[in-house]
């Protein structure tokens, strides 16, 4: 009979055994075609939950220069597999109109006051240009959480219905970190290979289009695909640059 310490050790052994088995099916010296990489991560997935499919992209930019910060939004053709809660902050006279957009909540100053009180219950906040002065009162609260409405991300708009629809259907916000990397969840392991591949292509395409004019040399330096618990698979960059999109 195993004692409790042995049981814990056995659990750790099972996990590490699964990782070793998964890693054994990946050639670390090889860069994989996108479709083959999607197939591999599905094959080696061992977690007992619906893992997120993650992508990590190393960019040839210097984020310490504001002109080389890469940021944007990519619509995921296959969705993200997540339920996104959306809040719309608008003028009082627009409340009835925007309540038909499909947002989870539509309000005005009441939502701003709720945020001030620490009630931040939504994944995306959308507002109109006319409300930006009022919304700026909570910029220090929403900003560090990546929730502040931003014209560059499309979340400051008069076309609220279209943006709510886009957000609800699935999109990924991306921003390069201090090390020059972009990390994003682009779907679930339960997605088909076609669905994962479509989302990868959509995200990388959006990142290529967001290349700063000041960034010189190689833009895409490495792309890795993985799941929440699994090892990473390196992708062949030429899959995305054959048309010359990498360089401007």
Curated annotation (Swiss-Prot):
The UniProt record lists the keyword tRNA-binding: yes
One GO cellular component term: large ribosomal subunit
GO biological process: regulation of translation; translation
Pfam families cross-referenced by the UniProt entry: Ribosomal_L1
Alphabetized UniProt keyword annotations: Repressor, Ribonucleoprotein, Ribosomal protein, RNA-binding, rRNA-binding, Translation regulation, tRNA-binding
GO molecular function: rRNA binding; structural constituent of ribosome; tRNA binding
Database matches in InterPro entries: Ribosom_uL1_bac-type, Ribosomal_uL1, Ribosomal_uL1-like, Ribosomal_uL1/biogenesis, Ribosomal_uL1_3-a/b-sand, Ribosomal_uL1_CS
Gene3D superfamilies with a match to the protein in the record: 3.30.190.20, 3.40.50.790
Family note: Belongs to the universal ribosomal protein uL1 family.
HAMAP family (alphabetical): Ribosomal_uL1_B
Summary of subunit composition and partner proteins: Part of the 50S ribosomal subunit.
Stated role: Binds directly to 23S rRNA. The L1 stalk is quite mobile in the ribosome, and is involved in E site tRNA release.
The name this protein goes by in its record: Large ribosomal subunit protein uL1
